[in-house]
Amino acid sequence: MSRVCQVTGKRPAVGNNRSHANNATKRRFLPNLHTHRFWVEGEKRFVSLRVSAKGMRIIDKRGVEVVLAELRASGVKV
């Protein structure tokens, strides 16, 4: 399963670790993803989404049914 938020599209980013001597080594910054079940009142069922913390805030603000409608319109099977 890829490390991509289904709501925001956040993906791993690439950057550098920096030591005290300022040596650079490559690293990945991973998004804060969680598999979370959301209750969809209109469908009377739970829907599992892999979302970041920011994605959960978006769902809290706009509502799960609005976000699901946008996901389905973009071709995501939910």
Swiss-Prot record:
GO terms for molecular function: structural constituent of ribosome. It holds the Pfam family Ribosomal_L28. SUPFAM superfamilies: L28p-like (SSF143800). GO terms for biological process: translation. It comes from the Bacteria. GO terms for cellular component: cytosolic large ribosomal subunit. Residues 1-24 are annotated as: Disordered. Disulfide bonds: none annotated. Keywords: Ribonucleoprotein, Ribosomal protein. Transmembrane segments: none annotated. Belongs to the bacterial ribosomal protein bL28 family. This is Large ribosomal subunit protein bL28. It comes from Aeromonas salmonicida (strain A449). The gene is rpmB.
